[in-house]
């Protein structure tokens, strides 16, 4: 229960023990401020939560590969864990035929048999020209037209269309063109999915990172798991002068301007008696008929597993409703208008509350962006400049 602690002893209430909330609490503790974190799940780390089973580090909410060009973020996270340098190399399965991702010379050879950049560029230009001719002088009106105008019909039909429609639960002709502003195309033989300088997986998983933040906080962070903020909302808001809220902003305001749209995910995991089920950490299924979007085989992230055992997880996108977890926002014009109403309400009615994170700001963040946004919030809250103390060997 919330009354387990004397709430008068805290400087901050933090709603949500995911990365944003945990970083803020840790940095507040370094500045002598005490925080109470309430988390509805039975554990910390949010969607980055990991656990070890059969010697395999399993990501409980989909594959999280850390990648960034931000050295400050990279140095910061490595205070708490060793990273293994893993680079994601995704394979796409379209009706039983395999292609490398992202789109690069390997993909083009698999698609068309082209062997040189000139041949691949000519093939793409030929297909783009046909697409632009069909459009006439107008701009693409939907995602399908946008994608074909950027990359051509072959790659769109086999590697984009089915995956995207499953991910969003909408036909590509019903999705706005701005979802795909550009497509990464490489005219080199390079399967490294993320084109970032710093990449890797924490050895032992992500949960330990936030456990170490707690252990290093000198008793200035308390966490109540299995505690739903909304069961105690009025009491907590009346007792805490400063709040960091990382949940859904529309839920905080009881959906008074309407529900924002989200996409949800469902995961099915299976232990298999094998040392190697699919030969790769991530395989995307890009056809429309396969109900899941990808299959993860976790042992390939770090090479660690008990002999003869592997664990796979299938990821199924699904419509969100209030009984499901919200994973990512649907940032179309309608939802943007609704979110702006909530953001204005937050500024005017609750200046004492910081709304942060992916759900609090109704914005998709990669992990490094969550860290960077948390740094920005800390700097604003405590009126400091660069004050994140860490040291690393720059050669790593």
Model regions: which residues?
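Mid-domain catalytic core of redox enzymes
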Residues: 31, 227-348
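C-terminal catalytic lobe of FAD-dependent flavoproteins
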Residues: 325-396
């Amino acid at each position: 229960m919330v009354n387990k602690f004397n709430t008068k002893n805290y400087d901050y209430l933090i709603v949500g023990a995911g990365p944003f909330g945990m970083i803020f609490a840790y940095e507040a503790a370094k500045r002598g401020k005490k925080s109470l974190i309430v988390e509805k799940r039975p554990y910390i780390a949010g969607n980055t939560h990991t656990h070890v089973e059969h010697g395999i580090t399993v990501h409980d909410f989909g594959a999280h590969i850390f990648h960034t060009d931000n050295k400050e973020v990279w140095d910061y996270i490595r205070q708490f864990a060793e990273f293994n340098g893993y680079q994601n190399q995704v394979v796409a399965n379209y009706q039983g035929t395999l292609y490398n991702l992202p789109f690069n010379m390997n993909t083009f050879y698999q698609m068309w048999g082209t062997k040189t950049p000139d041949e691949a560029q000519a093939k793409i230009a030929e297909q783009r020209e046909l697409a632009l001719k069909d459009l006439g002088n107008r701009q693409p009106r939907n995602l399908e037209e946008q994608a074909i105008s950027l990359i051509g019909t072959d790659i769109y039909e086999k590697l984009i269309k089915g995956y995207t429609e499953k991910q969003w639960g909408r036909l590509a002709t019903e999705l706005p063109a701005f979802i795909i502003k550009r497509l990464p195309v490489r005219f080199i033989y390079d399967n490294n999915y993320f084109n970032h300088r710093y990449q890797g997986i924490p050895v032992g998983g992500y949960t330990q990172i936030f456990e170490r933040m707690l252990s290093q906080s000198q008793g200035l962070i308390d966490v109540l798991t299995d505690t739903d903020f909304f069961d105690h909302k009025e009491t907590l808001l009346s007792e805490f002068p400063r709040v960091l809220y990382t949940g859904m902003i529309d839920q905080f305001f009881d959906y008074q301007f309407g529900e924002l749209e989200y996409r949800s995910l469902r995961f099915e995991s299976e232990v298999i008696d094998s040392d190697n089920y699919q030969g790769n950490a991530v395989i995307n299924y890009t056809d429309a008929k396969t109900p899941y979007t990808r299959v993860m085989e976790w042992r390939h992230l770090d090479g660690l597993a008990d002999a003869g055992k592997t664990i796979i997880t299938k990821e199924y996108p699904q419509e969100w409703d209030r009984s499901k977890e919200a994973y990512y926002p649907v940032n179309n014009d309608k939802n943007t208008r609704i979110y702006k109403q909530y953001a204005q309400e937050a500024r005017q009615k609750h200046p004492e509350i910081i709304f942060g994170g992916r759900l609090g700001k109704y914005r998709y963040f990669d992990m490094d962006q969550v860290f960077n946004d948390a740094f920005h919030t800390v700097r604003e809250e405590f009126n400091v400049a660069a004050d994140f103390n860490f040291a690393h060997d720059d050669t790593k």
